[in-house]
Amino acid sequence: MEKEFVFGHQNPDTDAIGTAIAFSYLQNKLGYNTEAVALGEPNDETAYALKKFGFEAPRVIKKAAPEVNAVMLVDHNEPQQSVSDIDKVKVTHVVDHHRIMNFNTADPLYYRAEPMGCTSTIVWKMFNENGIEIPEKLAGLMLSAIISDTLLLKSPTTTDDDKKAVEALAKIANVDYKEYGLAMLKAGTNISDKSEEELIDLDAKSFALNGHNVRVAQINVVDLPEALERKDAFLKAMEASSNDNGYDMFMLLITNILDSDSEALVVGSDETKELFEKAFDKKLNDSEVKLPGVVSRKKQVVPPLTEAFEG
């Protein structure tokens, strides 16, 4: 059977990489010939999880078409978040937990989208539905993905299925998920050794909102005031990135994983800043605003932005 690539979105997080590995394993068990690849290097948190459970990072690809004719997508569907030549390959499978936007195919496909906290939760359900056993180390990686996306089950995106998956996978992986989860999340919060340019690109996604190209980046920290000491440098990097890439607005969400509070930094035109303020019903103060309890880009940031920009 002809090989297909399985991959998550650009600037991959633990869900994008971990779930690509898990879904590739599942599909191979079901008779497909797949390879899990990535659209970027793993971040510190993901590297911690990969090392903990004995996985090599998937190789990074820039294009898919030179090697394969077909691909399977996990943790995304929007083409601007996918491989650069996504229009040159056939998408045969999508497993995702985000909104569906700007996604079209010429042929029928397998598409599974559920409002779960993490794509790995959906893949866990698929393992169970197909009666396929999850190996211990893979269970640990899938567990890591769910912990990452749900901030140790504290995010408002968390569902009962996410909680069930965490309990089940932790048992298979033989780990205390609370102890391991906090250690893994903390591994991803060291920002001192990275430049502002690196940080605003680590976990960033682009969204097309009513003709506007909106970039939303997020970084997790354990010390919010310390991170905000770099505010001016962050804003400068965001302005430069916007100019280079044609973003109409760039939002950086800085989230304290310990108390689930965030601050947002925003650059853009007067128009897009007004739309941002409309979305969150808050006024920006020197390009900054407090967003208590906002931790999820998917559930708490993109929906109000979409409503404001398209309203």
From Swiss-Prot:
Cofactor note: Binds 2 manganese ions per subunit.
Annotated source species: Lactobacillus helveticus (strain DPC 4571)
Top-tier EC class: hydrolase
A Gene Ontology molecular function term of the record: inorganic diphosphate phosphatase activity
Designated gene of the protein: ppaC
Name of this chain's protein: Probable manganese-dependent inorganic pyrophosphatase
Any one cellular-component term (Gene Ontology): cytoplasm
Binding site for Mn(2+) 2: 15, 75, 97, 149
Presence of keyword Aminoacyl-tRNA synthetase: no
Native organism taxonomy: Bacteria, Bacillati, Bacillota, Bacilli, Lactobacillales
